[in-house]
Amino acid sequence: MELAEIRNELEKTAQQIKDFRGSLDLDSMEVRIAELEDQMLDPNFWNDQQAAQKVINESNGYKETYQAFHALEEEQESMEISLELLKEEADEDLQAELEKDIKAYVATISEFELKLMLSDPYDKNNAILELHPGAGGTESQDWGSMLLRMYQRWSEKKGFKVEMLDYQAGDEAGIKSVTLLIKGHNAYGYLKAEKGVHRLVRISPFDSSGRRHTSFVSVDVMPELDDEIEIEVRTEDLKIDTYRATGAGGQHINTTDSAVRMTHIPSGIVVTCQSERSQLKNREQAMKMLKTKLYQKEQEEKERELAEIRGEQKEIGWGSQIRSYVFHPYSMVKDHRTNYETGNIQAVMDGDLDDFINAYLRSRIG
């Protein structure tokens, strides 16, 4: 990279920093951080643990953005100083180091830009992710377990905590359905990119003839909603069943009927939860999931009405095939919404989803 190219790159990044500063109200952010820290110093702060955690999460979100922006500014200034030194006197080692720093810096700016994109009302929330294999028995159920592992690996890489709210094992292998609660800042903002049907093409390990099979799993993603969301659920509209919780492999993991299946009769929505040993706690979690699904249904109906008014033929909800994972006759993962693809299918199955997620988020604001 010549000095002129380095200068051009730094001029581009300087403009991006200027744009970030223009879109971020840093003064208001400082004031809000101070207000939240004052709340945390209150002796009664932990009396309501749920409210306390909400304050902490909001504070952490602002601090992360504020500190990350200032770190970018400092790095920009440092690299501009290095460029001035190189203009005065050639230094191969310094130039090589600066080229390396610029590449890393561009990637960091890109990541920061993505975080700013996550500005929808519930992007910052935890995510509830459900996997539902399609028709095809063992083959599609095994594909479900492969996706389960993929999302667990991705969550680990992000530093997110994963709780398994419900697990229904497949008859021979894999899963019939799984519900995960993925906890972390912006978990829903990232994972909403995964909502839709995921298609697998491979030589089936369950087919003695070695034929190629196509399997489908539907992935549904919802934000975990706070209690202040007003959704009325009448007791007479509910059918509640209890049963023994089961783990992977189908074994009973509790001797009491602690697992809960809750059916909302008017909508037909069914939720299940078996993550807690207490039936009461499972009921509470199931009710939270039900309210989330009812809220999501309400929002999707509003979107559908708006789309009809605008004359848009937009499919809302799940049912659209969003991504293909091809193991045979070649290796490729392709997102059909953004056309982003990679041949490194194993890395994707090991949780390297960020490039797909980032491409989707950029496409929504592009």
From Swiss-Prot:
GO cellular component, one term: cytoplasm
GO biological process: viral translational frameshifting
Residues where N5-methylglutamine is found: Q251
Keyword Metal-binding in annotation: no
UniProt keyword Nucleotide-binding, yes or no: no
Keywords: Cytoplasm, Methylation, Protein biosynthesis
Coiled coil (UniProt feature): none
SMART domains: PCRF
Major location (coarse): cytoplasm
Modification after translation, per record: Methylated by PrmC. Methylation increases the termination efficiency of RF2.
Gene3D superfamilies: 3.30.160.20, 3.30.70.1660, Release factor
Compartments, as annotated in UniProt: Cytoplasm
InterPro entries documented for this protein: PCRF (IPR005139), Pep_chain_release_fac_I (IPR000352), Pep_chain_release_fac_I_sf (IPR045853), PrfB (IPR004374)
Any GO MF annotation of the entry: translation release factor activity, codon specific
Additional comment: The gene for this protein contains a UGA in-frame termination codon after Leu-24; a naturally occurring frameshift enables complete translation of RF-2. This provides a mechanism for the protein to regulate its own production.
Family matches, as HAMAP family: Rel_fac_2
NCBIfam families, alphabetized: prfB
Functional description taken from the UniProt entry: Peptide chain release factor 2 directs the termination of translation in response to the peptide chain termination codons UGA and UAA.
Recorded family membership: Belongs to the prokaryotic/mitochondrial release factor family.
Protein name per its UniProtKB record: Peptide chain release factor 2
Species this chain originates from: Listeria innocua serovar 6a (strain ATCC BAA-680 / CLIP 11262)
Source species taxonomy: Bacteria, Bacillati, Bacillota, Bacilli, Bacillales
